[in-house]
From Swiss-Prot:
Disulfide bonds: none annotated. NDH-1 shuttles electrons from NADH, via FMN and iron-sulfur (Fe-S) centers, to quinones in the respiratory chain. The immediate electron acceptor for the enzyme in this species is believed to be ubiquinone. Couples the redox reaction to proton translocation (for every two electrons transferred, four hydrogen ions are translocated across the cytoplasmic membrane), and thus conserves the redox energy in a proton gradient. This subunit may bind ubiquinone. The gene is nuoH. This is NADH-quinone oxidoreductase subunit H. It is an enzyme of class 7 (translocase). The keyword Acetylation does not apply. GO terms for cellular component: plasma membrane. Its EC number is 7.1.1.-. InterPro entries: NADH_UbQ_OxRdtase_su1/FPO, NADH_UbQ_OxRdtase_su1_CS. GO terms for molecular function: NADH dehydrogenase activity; oxidoreductase activity, acting on NAD(P)H, quinone or similar compound as acceptor; quinone binding. Belongs to the complex I subunit 1 family. It comes from the Bacteria. It catalyses: a quinone + NADH + 5 H(+)(in) = a quinol + NAD(+) + 4 H(+)(out).
Length: 341
C-alpha cells in the first residue's frame, strides 16, 4: 500500500506534503492557544479585580473566544477613504505572517523542530526586528494622526528594547557556544540558565513586555491619549490579524524565555524520571511566563513615554552590556568558554 501511494506522486511532492502537514501541526495549535490566551487573560484579570470574567458563552465561558472570533469575522472591513489601501490591508497580514513564521525554529521537544538550523537565534532576532514594519505601515497608511503617532511610538519602543534583548542573547550564547536553539536547551541539562543569569532573566521578561507592547509598556495603544494607537482605523478581520499577531508574539516571548532560561523541554526539580513528554513541560513553562505577563498587566500602571525610553537606554542597555562583559570575563578567566580548540 505504501509503495502504491509512493508511486502515485513524485518524491518531492511527498516531501512538500510532509512539510505542509508539519506547518499545520504547529499553526493550528498556536491559533487555538492564542484564542484561549485571550480567555485566560480576561479570567485572570477578572479574578484580580474580584470579577468573574467571561462566564456566559459555553460552560465557564469556554466558548467566548469562538464568539469573539465569529463577531470579528462577520463584521464589515471599513477602509478609510484617504488611506493607502494596499499598505493598509498589507500591514496586518505582514504582522500576522511574521508572528507565525518565527515558530519554525522553536524546538518543542528533543528533535521536534520544523527547521533545525544552526542560526536559529539569529533567525528569531531578525523576524522580531521585522515586526515593527507592520505597525509603522499601519500607522502611516491609515492617514490618521493618532494611528501615525502610535506607529512612531511603537517603532521607537521596539527598537530601544531590541538592543538590550540582543546583548542578553549574546550573554546566553557565550555560555552555550552555539546559535542553535536545541543546543541552548541541552546545555541546561545540569543547571538552568536562570540560576547564573538571573538578572538577565528579569531584564528579558521586562524587555519582552516592551517588545510585545504589553502593559505597563503599551504606549502604542495608549487609549487614554491616542484613542487606540496604530490600529485605531482597523476593524473586523484586519483588526483580528493584529490581535492574533500580538498574542502570538506574546507566546513566542514565553517560548524564548523558556528556551533561554528555563531549560526548554527539560523537566524541573529532577523530575525527568516521570513519564511526562518534554512537550508538556515546555507548554507548562510557557503558561507560567504568560501568567506573569497577565499578572503584570493587572498590577502596574502605564509608564510615561520619557520614563519608558529612559529605562530602555539608561538602565537596561548599560546593565545588559555590563553583564555581557562580566560573563565573557568569567568564562575566559576560568577556562569555561565552550567549544575551545
Amino acid at each position: 500500500m505504501v509503495d502504491l501511494l509512493t508511486g502515485l506522486l513524485p518524491p518531492f511532492v511527498w516531501r512538500l506534503l510532509i512539510i505542509v502537514l508539519q506547518i499545520v501541526a504547529i499553526v493550528l495549535p498556536l491559533l487555538i492557544a492564542v484564542a484561549y490566551l485571550t480567555y485566560a487573560e480576561r479570567k485572570v484579570i477578572g479574578a484580580m479585580q474580584l470579577r468573574k470574567g467571561p462566564n456566559v458563552v459555553g460552560p465557564f465561558g469556554l466558548l467566548q473566544p469562538m464568539a469573539d472570533g465569529l463577531k470579528l469575522f462577520v463584521k464589515e472591513t471599513v477602509l478609510p477613504t484617504s488611506a493607502n489601501r494596499v499598505v493598509f490591508v498589507g500591514a496586518p497580514m505582514l504582522t500576522f505572517f511574521l508572528a507565525l513564521v518565527a515558530w519554525a525554529v522553536i524546538p518543542f521537544d528533543k528533535g521536534w523542530v520544523l527547521a533545525d538550523i544552526n542560526v536559529g537565534v539569529l533567525y528569531l532576532f531578525a523576524i522580531s526586528s521585522l515586526g515593527v514594519y507592520g505597525i509603522i505601515m499601519a500607522g502611516w497608511a491609515s492617514n490618521s494622526k493618532y494611528a501615525f503617532l502610535g506607529g512612531l511610538r511603537s517603532a521607537a519602543q521596539m527598537v530601544s528594547y531590541e538592543v538590550s534583548i540582543g546583548f542578553i542573547l549574546i550573554s546566553v550564547l557565550l555560555t552555550v557556544g552555539s546559535l542553535n536553539l536545541s543546543d541552548v536547551v541541552t546545555a541546561q541539562s545540569k543547571m538552568w540558565f536562570i540560576v547564573p543569569h538571573f538578572p538577565l532573566f528579569i531584564l528579558f521578561i521586562i524587555s519582552g513586555l516592551a517588545e510585545t507592547n504589553r502593559a505597563p509598556f503599551d504606549l502604542p495603544e495608549a487609549e487614554a491619549e491616542l484613542v487606540a494607537g496604530y490600529n485605531v482605523e482597523y476593524s473586523a478581520m484586519t483588526f483580528a490579524l493584529f490581535f492574533l499577531g500580538e498574542y502570538a508574539n506574546m507566546l513566542m516571548m514565553g517560548a524564548m524565555t523558556s528556551i533561554l532560561f528555563l531549560g526548554g523541554w527539560m523537566a524541573p526539580f529532577g523530575l525527568g524520571w516521570l513519564p511526562i513528554p518534554g512537550l508538556i513541560w515546555f507548554v507548562l513553562k510557557i503558561c507560567l511566563v504568560m501568567f506573569v505577563f497577565l499578572w503584570v498587566r493587572a498590577t502596574f500602571p502605564r509608564y510615561r513615554y520619557d520614563q519608558l525610553m529612559r529605562l530602555g537606554w539608561k538602565v537596561f542597555l548599560p546593565f545588559s552590556l555590563f553583564w555581557l562583559v562580566l560573563t565573557a570575563s568569567v568564562l575566559t578567566a576560568f577556562g569555561w568558554l565552550p567549544n575551545q580548540g
